[in-house]
Each structure stands twice: as C-alpha cells, then as structure tokens.
Curated annotation (Swiss-Prot):
Its membrane topology: Multi-pass membrane protein
Primary location recorded for the protein, binned into one broad class: plastid
NCBIfam families: ATP_synt_c, PRK07354.1
A GO MF label: lipid binding
Protein name: ATP synthase subunit c, chloroplastic
Residues that bear N-formylmethionine: 1
GN (gene name): atpH
GO CC annotations, alphabetized: chloroplast thylakoid membrane; proton-transporting ATP synthase complex; proton-transporting two-sector ATPase complex, proton-transporting domain
Length: 82
C-alpha cells in the first residue's frame, strides 16, 4: 500500500470519529438539560420525559456509530488501497 494512502486513511479515520462525535455530544447535552428542566417543572411527567430522552439518545448515538463504522472501513477494508 502506498504510504501516503495509508497515512491519509489513518488521519481520515480519526477525523471521522472525532467529527461524528461532536454533534451528537452537543445534542445529548442539550437534550439532557431540557429533560431535567422539564422534570423540574412537571415531576409527574418524569416517565414520559425519560422515555423520550432515552429514545432520542439512541438516535443521536447512532450517528456516532456510523462515524465509527466509516473509520473502521478506512482502517481495515480500505477501498483506496488498490
């Protein structure tokens, strides 16, 4: 494998995971903050809020997992290795 392709693949894999984690991380923090605020306002709605929060966390975390899959594909099944 060309050393430039190998080095670029490693850097790209790192960027894929790093950038894929920024958005969901910020979104999870915001969602958790609003969930705590909502539970503080209406304690009787805690179950519904928590259920919606966990479901939204799952959807947000899937974006990070997609970034990890792209990084693993670049590292171990590199389509550019030729």
């Amino acid at each position: 494998m060309n050393p430039i392709v190998a080095a670029t693949s490693v850097v790209s894999a790192g960027l894929a995971v790093g950038l894929a984690a920024i958005g969901p991380g910020m979104g999870q923090g915001t969602a958790a903050g609003y969930a705590v605020e909502g539970i503080a306002r209406q304690p009787e709605a805690e179950g519904k809020i928590r259920g919606a929060l966990l479901l939204s966390f799952a959807f947000m975390e899937s974006l990070t997992i997609y970034g990890l899959v792209v990084a693993l594909a670049l590292l171990f099944a590199n389509p550019f290795a030729g």
